[in-house]
Amino acid sequence: MASAMRGEKCERSRIRELVLILSLITMAGDSRATPFDPSFFIEGVQSEVVNPFNRTILNRFNLTEEQILSIQNRSNPNMRDDSAQSSNQQYLQQVATQRLNDIFKRVQKAISNEPNGSASKEKAGFPICNAETTNPEDWSLGNNVTLQFASSVFISNNDDRLSSALLRLYKTNPGQTREHNPGQASTQPISTENPGNTAPNCAEQPPVGPQIRVTVSIVHQQRKKQRKKRTCNTAMLSSSSTGWVEIDVKCALAYWEQQHRQQLRQQQPLQPQLTASVVGILMIEVHDDEENLLRPGLYFAPPTCDQADIAVPWSVYRTEPFKSHLASWTLPRKPRLDIFFNGSNSMKNSYNTPKSRAFIESTTSNSPTIDNQLDESGEYESQQRVHAPLVHHRRHHHNHQQPESESESAQLEAEIEAEELMSSASNSEQQMEPISNHHRHRTGHHHPHHQLHQHHHHHHRHTKHHRIPAHKQE
């Protein structure tokens, strides 16, 4: 009995051992742990290798996937390099995008038609040497003097639009003995500031003396006997003042550009041949305050042939690097034409400028400047009433007819704008005659030959545009 009980207990203990061994084997098979070096273990700290993608482990330690990834990045140096490389690539992409945007903005600004984004050009030129401008006797003894400029100075290139045009003349005092060489002038008296603003005490300024009126006209024909002119601008200044005088002659350049385009069209076949008009010639006349004719050569320095056709732009003399060289250098007192061009802008903006306006610049503190404030409102209004119906009819006709091409329509628009500018400046075209009679007969009416020429030119445009619909119907 006792032996039977002992045998049963042994069997039970063996069964328990077998079950324990089987359970240990099963647990060892399920475990994926790798052996660790005992040196890595710290007393009181247990380490356990877990699978980061095991949700049970995440829930057990209350961790998120972002936290597991951050732990892996800190522990794995290879993954740390990959993250740094990706951040560098993102930074380089951002820099490249910013540079591309900057380049795109610069290119867009360069090709835009806005005035701020367009390039500006400046030209300057001295008169061309001919018998009238280079003969000292004609300049000092003639009742009027002429200046001829080369077409390369005032003709624009690459569709540049005219911004400003100034005729600069050096005013001399005929009653004062000139100590300097009449052909050269020191750069020290030249100043762009108003002498009245620089003087500390206005009471020291002498009273304004006799005044003279300078008239700049556009010459239409080369021959003296048949020469015709058209007033471009006038300016009033003191008779005793000395220094540079600036007169706006933008209306002259608008007329020259129009005549230049007409001459180019006449060179083409099947074009009507009109009377050739000269371009680039300006006439200067001087009158006193009682309308008596004076000699311009006594008040302005003449040009000479020792000067080239192309002059240094006026703005160059104002630059700081150039001022240091002007201390021992003299500036020529020759008549000059300074022109400023803008980039490709609209036609209307290029010719939309103040009418009959002159900017006078004096270089003597004792010679205050006087603006051009001649009262010609009545004459201007009468000219506008005569010219307004013709321009309105032309615009109405061009708006209802389709032009042959965009370039021709642009040329027609430019011609109309130029005619408006010329009519606003002056429409008094007449034969050369004494100046006293010139102002006595000065009215707002056109010359009969000029009216006939305008009527013929306007009728030719109507015939040209009426042919277009007939051609399309065929």
Curated annotation (Swiss-Prot):
Record field: compositional bias (Polar residues): 183-195, 359-372
Segments for region (Disordered): 173-195, 359-474
GO CC, alphabetical: extracellular region
Tissues and organs where the protein is expressed, per its UniProt entry: Synthesized in some glial cells and secreted.
Sites where a glycan is attached: N54, N62, N73, N116, N144, N342
Top-level taxonomic group: Eukaryota
Bias (Basic residues) ranges: 390-400, 437-474
Designated name of the protein: Protein anachronism
Organism: Drosophila melanogaster
